Amino acid sequence: MDHAPYGGVVPEIAARAHVESIDAIAAEAMRAADLGFDQLDGVAATAGPGLVGGVMVGLAFGKAVSLARGVPLVAVNHLEGHAVSARLGADIAYPFLLLLVSGGHCQLLEVSGVGACKRLGTTIDDAAGEAFDKIAKTLGLPYPGGPALEKLAVGGDAARYTLPRALLGRKDCDFSFSGLKTAAARIAETLTTDDERRDLAAAVQGAIARQLSERVDRAMKLYKESHAPDEQRFVVAGGVAANGAVRAALLADCEKNGFSFAAPPLAYCTDNAAMIALAGAERLALGISDDLDAVARPRWPLDEAAALANPANAYGRKGAKA
């Protein structure tokens, strides 16, 4: 079912679509891989964080296959899937500095191995991808808004509008996009021409790319204090990693600070099953699996210690944020 008329994902529609589609999609995936279920060595299923209705459907399906075939289950944090997604297209060794940037998440992490993440910074309000999508909606663009805004921004004059630069000069690695989102929405209400909309799209894209670049530059300096030169690897993952302006800004950070750059193939920037399979395979290779009583988790921080240490940024009314 199409979420576009609603301007975003509707949880109830998404959960029902999972129920209706998962059997056929799993069967098609096995046909495409030319494999039978009897050839599986294990099953990896997303257990969170995310909209819990859909997560429960996928996790239940994974448990059923695990039980029926007698193979181990790995309940995967989907953020860990993003963390390893660049390894789908390249041989990237641990450790590395990761920018995980999507519609729901914006974090900087040191990734030292499978499941070993130390958070350096996170958003204190909205994620970058959410800012892209919400501002795109105010400009009358279709969902998903990020790609539509990037397309509109081509040829726009980013200097036409002055937008706020949040947390400028801060020595930490946190992000903030709520002020940008509000300012852009107010400007959007006054626009009357396509050129104005194009220029605002370019300004928004530039502002988001600039803030990501500034915080990554800070994180690289911190990372270098505790890592050898041959460990200076940078990975960007998540849906926003597909944005060309963002990639260009982050590439410039890498060149400035002496880091290698890696990102998933464009097809694997957004949520996908391949990254979950890889995360599960890496855990299985280390002998790590989960019991069939693994639960679906709407919130699941990658760095539990950081979440506990900074509850103001890490916890909401419904528990630990991702």
Question: What residue ranges belong to the model's regions?
Answer:
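N-terminal beta-alpha supersecondary unit
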Residues: 1-49, 78
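Glycine-rich phosphate-binding/hydrolytic loop that grips phosphoryl groups
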Residues: 82-85, 264-302
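A contiguous, well-structured pocket-lining segment that forms one wall/lid of small-molecule binding clefts
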Residues: 151-234, 241-257, 304-322
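Conserved phosphate-binding catalytic cores of ATP/NTP-utilizing and phosphoryl-transfer enzymes
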Residues: 75-97, 279
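Short Gly/Thr/Asp-enriched flexible loops that form oxyanion-binding sites at enzyme active sites
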Residues: 45-69, 244-252
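Short glycine-rich phosphate-binding loop at a beta-alpha junction
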Residues: 36-47, 226-240, 262
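A short helix-loop
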Residues: 92, 100-101, 108-196, 252, ...
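Conserved phosphate-binding/catalytic loops in two-lobed NTP-binding clefts
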Residues: 75-76, 233, 251-276
